[in-house]
A protein has these predicted regions:
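Beta-strand-enriched accessory nucleic-acid recognition/scaffold domains that flank the catalytic cores
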Residues: 1-604, 611, 615-993
């Protein structure tokens, strides 16, 4: 009853009687103050009515958007919003400048502070909702909300809308790595929105059975939104296109046209794809332009594009997606992109986009100085854009098994004892790593994750942070173990010490021996008949920071690509040493001769950026070496007899949502492999593997994979964690592995024991701490926004990308991969701010600022611990009331250097916390505030900027506009003043300008 009443905006008074009286309902009227009645539109019934400009109350688009976002998230109810509230917002907004709008900032704070409480229970909805919106104007914290600092050049602010069957949820603009389209139209960035279609939020992804009509209404809603567009904040957004990764998660970009720029204009600029009449391929080609990329600075000498031939034989392409790049050009890319913090050597390969071309570029010594060599298999369409864009670089990460690969290897003859032995040792290793620093460092250096976070953690141990029990590091160590154990239990993710997970590329020298069809079904174990590969990886046991030492793998290996469902998806190969290939590392090199290319045998892979696992552990070499690969089914794509229209793209989007059965088929295959005697070799499993391959290609071919009822499991093994009524206990290898692993909970706890080596290193001025504290507030807001936008519970999960919760949409691997550029950009933003504050990257200037970030974080924790005393059984609730502590660790390398420095400490003992830094009210009196503004940054010398920041006090953002308003009476004059004179309010913004 309580939840139902709250849906109707009824405040629940727990002290009142149980008598309930029925009163007349309220109809929201505030929309009429902002929107004239339009023919055919009943605004009183709109769930998120359209705000429009009228003469008496004007709210800019970004203010209207934030207001609708607050309503959509349940913070405001329409009946509580009055004309007076709107007028107050409009008055605040009239003083808007280039950098801020007080009304927008007020609503942004309201949205972030309420939504970030992560109240999931409807029973607690009253903790989230504001019944009296006018009370916001009395909230000093809300009124003094500081605008975000600026972004790195490769990021952009993006608005996101989630459309469910019953409503829409709007999110505040969040920083995201940009793509080609958003960079080209950066002046229109507020006219782009990302839209995602889901079931209700607590359910997540929309799952549908194409045989039933129960979901027709739902998919009709999706179709209407795509066809008619979405109206938000007085703007009409229309469907633009869908990025390829977005597509699988049911997302798309929408754009609000102007008189001079339409969606058709943008699609035409993206590329010439009119010759493509397969709707799926047409959509996929447009989607290339939305890949998250970074662009290097222009080379003084430019780059020369040279077109070379593919290597083909009997209809198979051995160089599908791979090109070449000169050493000098590759070095220039890395110097100008700073793509990775962990690379100690120049990457051998770059995943890229260049106009309508895609794939990877591999370093080769025969490529002249500034040339890039492209192949026909890489060119997909012609595009106006001609710049080289980089997605990611080659890097080493350790190979791991999963439920599919274990199932396949087991059916090929690998004994179950091998898997059980490996899992038992891995569990023991995780336990030992919690107390043995040297062993933990070795394990972290060996078990490198896809984002390279474990190598950073290993360096933290080398810097002594495990010995001092530094709280942030110790929590990271525990979450790494809990995350690893969860994946062990749920995914059978067993790390393989003698294994690698790397990009695939081609042998341009044609030295490696290729595959022979004559060996298919052969019982021979003659290594001279095996296809060959080349692989060079970091030496085992190399300490963190000493990368650059590599070893060439030789001997019998197993090779594959995830997911592997067919017995022939995993190949037995021979790794050999070829001197002409030794310049390549952290990539697996495939032969370019033979009857068929190896990548296509591995779950239909190619060389345009696919990752392959290579394992040379003798225990995992199967007894069956030559199982034939799955026969490729040449599905003929659906081709139109006319040009593709926008309506075709929309229909295909909805059709894909309704018929996407990829995960359903994968689960059916896993269950059937466990229940059937022959496992993956059973005809039913072979058919499911074929269907899965077709489902993977559905976004490219437009041909859906239909799962017949006879192939659907009636019951599931217990390790799949399905409903108890449809579960049986599995006695096969996956069931036994599942039972070995205990569930480990992650409960972070702060005890306040920070590293004294950093706290005592420098004597820090109060003014510096004050300014750094201001930057930390911005960091924490940005971190919370990332956590909220990506459904992440703690900052430790976000920082490490070791997420403990399952994603509502998409897979866990892809989610972790997508978080890497988000967190890299986040770190860069706040590193840049602190470096600008220091005035230099020189350690003498920068390290005191880094130490200040650690000091203010420590002080917040100390004071919070006093305010929130520990109570038995309240560890979790206490943790969530503590301040965020990840801010200093945007400088994890520099913190290590400070901690390990041999210099004398400037402080004899740990300083006492400065409680003034944590006052909730940052307001100075008017005289002091005007003095700060009067001492604002002037001149062009960077040192002057820094001095101004060191001597400034904490600045209340709302006061700035008030002071400016006293000096100017018109909006035009305000803009003029903003451009001509920097005020104290802009001190933080200048840090990243």
């Amino acid at each position: 009853m309580k939840a139902a009443l709250q849906e109707f905006n009824i405040v629940i008074d727990h002290k009142s009687s149980n008598d309930i009286k029925i009163v007349p309902s309220l109809i929201p009227s505030f929309w009429d103050s902002l929107e004239p009645q339009q023919p055919g539109i009943d605004t009183s019934k709109a769930s998120l009515a359209l705000l429009a400009d009228v003469e008496d109350i004007y709210l800019p688009y970004d203010v209207q958007y934030q207001l609708e976002a607050c309503i959509s998230q349940g913070i405001f109810n329409e009946v509580n919003i009055t004309t007076e509230f709107l007028r107050r917002l409009a008055n605040l907004s009239r003083g808007r400048t280039r950098r801020r709008d007080r009304a927008k900032d007020l609503l942004t704070y309201t949205l972030q502070s309420r939504v970030e409480n992560r109240v999931e229970s409807r029973d607690k909805l009253d903790e989230k909702r504001i019944y009296d919106p006018m009370s916001l104007f009395e909230d000093k914290t809300a009124m003094s909300h500081y605008p975000e600092i600026s972004l790195p050049g490769h990021c952009i602010w993006v608005r996101k809308v989630v459309v469910t069957p019953t409503t829409m949820y709007l999110s505040s603009p969040a920083p995201e790595p940009s793509n080609r389209v958003l960079r080209q139209y950066t002046n229109y960035e507020d006219r782009f929105i990302r839209v995602q279609f889901t079931d209700e939020l607590i359910k997540g992804r929309i799952y549908s059975d194409p045989d039933t009509t129960r979901d027709n209404a739902l998919f009709n809603r999706v179709h209407r939104a795509l066809q008619n567009g979405i109206r938000i904040g007085g703007r009409h957004f229309q469907y633009l296109a869908t990025g390829n990764s977005q597509f699988r998660e049911h997302g798309a970009y929408f754009f609000c046209p102007t008189d001079f720029l339409t969606c058709d204009n943008i699609r035409n600029w993206m590329g010439d794809v009119n010759h493509i009449r397969v709707v799926a391929k047409y959509a996929s080609r447009l989607g290339q332009c939305f890949s998250t990329t970074r662009i290097p600075k222009a080379s003084p000498i430019g780059q020369a594009i040279v077109h070379i031939d593919d290597i083909e034989h009997d209809g198979w392409c051995f160089t599908d997606g791979v090109g070449k790049i000169a050493f000098s050009r590759a070095k220039f890319l890395m110097q100008n992109l700073d793509m990775t913090r962990t690379a100690k050597t120049l990457p051998s390969a770059f995943q890229f986009r260049l106009g309508g071309s895609k794939g990877i570029l591999v370093q080769w010594p025969d490529v002249p100085f500034n040339e890039v060599h492209l192949r026909p298999s890489q060119n997909k369409f012609n595009a106006v854009s001609k710049g080289l864009e980089i997605i990611k670089t080659s890097r080493f990460s350790i190979a791991s098994l999963n439920r599919q690969t274990i199932t396949i290897l087991s059916c090929l003859g690998v004994p179950d004892e091998a898997f059980e032995e490996m899992m038992k040792k891995q569990i023991a290793d995780y336990e030992r790593a919690m107390t043995d620093a040297e062993f933990a460092m070795q394990l972290l250096s060996k078990y490198v994750d896809q984002n390279g976070i474990t190598t950073i953690m290993a360096q933290m141990i080398a810097d002594g942070f495990m010995e001092t029990k530094e709280p942030f590091f110790m929590i990271l160590l525990h979450i790494w173990r809990a995350w690893s154990m969860r994946l062990l239990r749920e995914k059978a993710r067993i790390m393989v010490d003698k294994g690698a997970f790397v990009f695939g590329c081609a042998d341009e020298t044609r030295t490696l021996r290729g595959h022979s069809d004559a060996t298919d079904f052969s019982q021979s174990k003659d290594r001279n008949t095996l296809p060959q590969i080349f692989l060079q990886v970091p030496k085992t046991g190399v300490r963190t920071g000493e990368q650059g030492e590599y070893t060439v793998i030789t001997g019998i290996c197993v090779l594959g690509r995830n997911p592997s469902l067919h017995p022939g998806d995993i190949r037995v190969v021979e790794a050999v040493d070829v001197p002409a290939l030794r310049h390549l590392h952290d990539v697996v090199v495939f032969p370019t001769v033979g009857d068929r290319d190896i990548p296509s045998m591995c779950s239909g892979g190619d060389l345009d950026g696919d990752d392959y696992f290579v394992i040379w552990d003798p225990r995992l070499i199967p007894t069956e070496w030559n199982h034939p690969p799955m026969k490729q089914e040449n599905l003929k794509p659906k081709e139109l007899d006319r040009d593709v229209k926008l309506t075709d793209l929309i229909s295909f989007f909805v059709s894909y949502m309704k018929n996407d059965s990829l995960s359903t088929i994968a689960h059916a295959h896993l269950a059937k492999c466990d229940s059937l005697t022959d496992g993956p070799k059973d005809p039913q499993c072979i058919e499911l593997a074929r269907l899965h391959s077709n489902a993977v290609d559905y976004p490219k071919t437009g041909q859906k994979a239909y799962l017949e009822a006879s192939l659907r499991p009636k019951n599931y093994p217990h390790f799949m964690e399905k409903a108890p009524s449809r579960t049986y206990r599995s006695t096969k290898i996956l069931g036994r592995l599942y039972d070995q692993v205990a569930q480990i909970e992650f409960n972070p706890e702060l005890d306040g024991t920070f590293d004294q080596r950093i706290l005592r290193r420098y004597s820090l001025k109060y003014e510096l701490l004050k300014t750094v504290r201001m930057i930390k507030r911005q960091h924490d807001k940005a971190m919370r926004q990332i956590m909220n936008q990506h459904d992440i519970e703690t900052e430790f999960e976000a920082w490490s990308t070791f997420m403990m919760s399952k994603p509502r949409l998409g897979g866990e691997y892809k989610r972790q991969e997508n978080m890497e550029p988000v967190m890299t950009s986040h770190r860069e933003r706040f590193r840049d701010a602190c470096i600008k504050l220091a005035g230099s990257r020189d350690p003498d200037a920068l390290y005191p600022v880094v130490a200040a970030t650690y000091r203010v974080t420590w002080e917040e924790v100390q004071i919070a611990l006093r305010r929130v005393p520990a109570a038995v059984g309240e560890t979790e609730s206490r943790m969530y009331s503590m301040p965020l502590i990840s801010f200093p660790w945007v400088f994890e390398y520099e913190l290590g250097r400070i901690a390990m420095a041999k210099d004398k400490f400037e402080l004899e003992e740990v300083p006492k916390p400065t409680t003034a830094l944590l006052d909730d009210d940052y307001t100075d009196d008017d005289d002091e505030f005007k003095r700060i503004i009067g001492a604002s940054i002037s001149g062009s010398d960077e040192t002057d900027d820094v001095e101004g920041l060191y001597t400034g006090q904490s600045i209340q953002a709302t006061q700035v506009a008030e002071v400016v308003e006293e000096q100017s009476t018109t909006h035009e004059e305000l803009v003029e003043l903003e451009e001509d004179e920097d005020t104290g309010m802009d001190a933080l913004a200048k840090l990243t300008d």
